[in-house]
Amino acid sequence: MRPDVQWRLCWENELQLPDHLELSEFFRKTYEPTGAFNGKQFEGGRSWAGARPELRVIGYDVHGVAAHLGLLRRYIKVGDVDLLVAELGLYGVRPDLEGLGIAHSISVMYPVLQQLGVPFAFGSVRPALRNHVSRFCRKGLANILSGVRVRSTHPDVYLDLPPTRVDDNVLVLVLPIGRSMSEWPAGTLIDRNGPEL
């Protein structure tokens, strides 16, 4: 039986301190099983990991936050082409609801993507999530690009690390919104020009 999830679409400046605290707890519990550092970045009420989203879709049920997806419009560089996209990230589903799937979050976000008039939405996920996102892509709304590296800045300055990092072990998810997939630029390197969402 599908849980009764109510979706809230909110701009970042509409969130209040209790919202950030609840989301921070949600992200710690959702991301810690993938590695202690992944949960640590949400300590102290922080409800974002790298870049801060401008818009969020938050699913709630009787137990609190059930799911989350963030959006940030930005220009990325694909090969030699500058491209406006809506980056989708900070995706999470509470562990007891893992069957809820990314399709539910994106279906709530999709009309907003159309209203924003962006040509594409894009995000990157760990290869371990291939089956998870493949189910969504079978519906024809998105495409998985493999063999694409993604360069990002670190969200903070670390004296022992270079200012950028390149992920060459990610899957890139592209949703054509205002353009067709055939208009996505060719290239094997995406430069975020900032931290990951």
UniProtKB/Swiss-Prot annotation:
Its EC number is 2.3.1.-. GO terms for cellular component: cytosol. PROSITE patterns: NODA. It is an enzyme of class 2 (transferase). Pfam families: NodA. It is found in: Cytoplasm. GO terms for molecular function: acyltransferase activity. The keyword Transferase applies. Keywords: Acyltransferase, Cytoplasm, Nodulation, Transferase. InterPro entries: NodA (IPR003484), Nodulation_prot_NodA_CS (IPR020567). Disulfide bonds: none annotated. It comes from the Bacteria. HAMAP family: NodA. Belongs to the NodA family. N-acyltransferase required for nodulation. Acts in the production of a small, heat-stable compound (Nod) that stimulates mitosis in various plant protoplasts. This is Nodulation protein A. The gene is nodA.
